[in-house]
């Protein structure tokens, strides 16, 4: 099983990176939080890998930290959550927000992640509530991005993972949209990032 992959970034997209090592290119599925921290094309990256094997598929899922990989593995232990949905969940909510929402039983916040229905959210709370560590650095009562679309939430999550404060990040996303930025992730993310700098 592949557990660690170090190589050069050949291509990168919000949920996918192509890493070349030893003359071989590996397509690795990643959450937005990993995408935002990748080096420029040609830069070296080191990813913690979860190898998913089925009879017809061998898929690699990559994370920059062991903690994020461990959270991913906890998510896929929940009945009804596979690797693809787990990556969407990690892209839809920052890790600290996700842990806090599960520990508090905030089903209504979890169902805002694309692909997560009420039953899945309830199973996440039931099966993981006591297995997750307390989230650190979380402001109690921080405003949630309830009015944002799934793409907006991806951009917000990416900004939070870069260390932006939630109020400024959310305001930047709204301003970027109001200024006519494209509704696609990358242009919206670039414009919002300019606004928070």
Swiss-Prot record:
Q: Which family does it belong to?
A: Belongs to the RuvA family.
GO terms of biological process kind: DNA recombination; DNA repair
Q: What does this protein do?
A: The RuvA-RuvB-RuvC complex processes Holliday junction (HJ) DNA during genetic recombination and DNA repair, while the RuvA-RuvB complex plays an important role in the rescue of blocked DNA replication forks via replication fork reversal (RFR). RuvA specifically binds to HJ cruciform DNA, conferring on it an open structure. The RuvB hexamer acts as an ATP-dependent pump, pulling dsDNA into and through the RuvAB complex. HJ branch migration allows RuvC to scan DNA until it finds its consensus sequence, where it cleaves and resolves the cruciform DNA.
According to the record, the residues making up region (Domain III) are 153-197
Q: How does it assemble?
A: Homotetramer. Forms an RuvA(8)-RuvB(12)-Holliday junction (HJ) complex. HJ DNA is sandwiched between 2 RuvA tetramers; dsDNA enters through RuvA and exits via RuvB. An RuvB hexamer assembles on each DNA strand where it exits the tetramer. Each RuvB hexamer is contacted by two RuvA subunits (via domain III) on 2 adjacent RuvB subunits; this complex drives branch migration. In the full resolvosome a probable DNA-RuvA(4)-RuvB(12)-RuvC(2) complex forms which resolves the HJ.
Task: Give any Pfam family that matches.
Answer: RuvA_N
Recorded GO molecular functions are: ATP binding; four-way junction DNA binding; four-way junction helicase activity
Tell me yes or no: is DNA damage among this UniProt entry's keywords: yes
Q: Which GO terms describe its cellular component?
A: cytoplasm; Holliday junction helicase complex; Holliday junction resolvase complex
For region Flexible linker, the annotated ranges are 144-153
Keywords in alphabetical order, please.
Cytoplasm, DNA damage, DNA recombination, DNA repair, DNA-binding
**Domain II, as annotated region:** 65-143
Give the start-end ranges of region Domain I: 1-64
Query: Is Ribosomal protein found in the keyword set?
Result: no
Localization recorded for this chain is:
Cytoplasm
Q: What is this protein called?
A: Holliday junction branch migration complex subunit RuvA
Comment on protein domains: Has three domains with a flexible linker between the domains II and III and assumes an 'L' shape. Domain III is highly mobile and contacts RuvB.
**Gene that specifies this protein:** ruvA
């Amino acid at each position: 099983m592949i557990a660690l992959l170090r190589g050069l970034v050949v291509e990168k997209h919000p949920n996918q990176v192509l890493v070349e090592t030893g003359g071989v290119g590996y397509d690795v599925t990643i959450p937005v939080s990993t995408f935002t921290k990748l080096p420029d094309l040609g830069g070296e990256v080191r990813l913690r890998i979860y190898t998913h094997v089925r009879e017809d598929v061998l898929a690699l899922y990559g994370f920059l930290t062991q903690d994020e990989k461990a959270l991913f593995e906890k998510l896929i232990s929940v009945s009804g959550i596979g690797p693809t949905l787990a990556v969407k969940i990690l892209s839809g909510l920052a890790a600290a927000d996700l842990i806090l929402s599960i520990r508090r039983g905030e089903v209504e916040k979890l169902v805002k992640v694309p692909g997560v229905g009420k039953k899945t959210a309830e199973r996440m709370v039931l099966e993981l509530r006591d297995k997750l560590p307390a989230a650190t650095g979380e402001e109690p009562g921080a405003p949630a991005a309830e009015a944002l679309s799934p793409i907006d939430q991806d951009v917000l999550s990416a900004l939070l993972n870069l260390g932006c404060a939630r109020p400024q990040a959310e305001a930047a996303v709204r301003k970027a949209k109001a200024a006519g930025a494209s509704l696609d992730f990358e242009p919206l993310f670039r414009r919002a990032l300019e606004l928070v700098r």
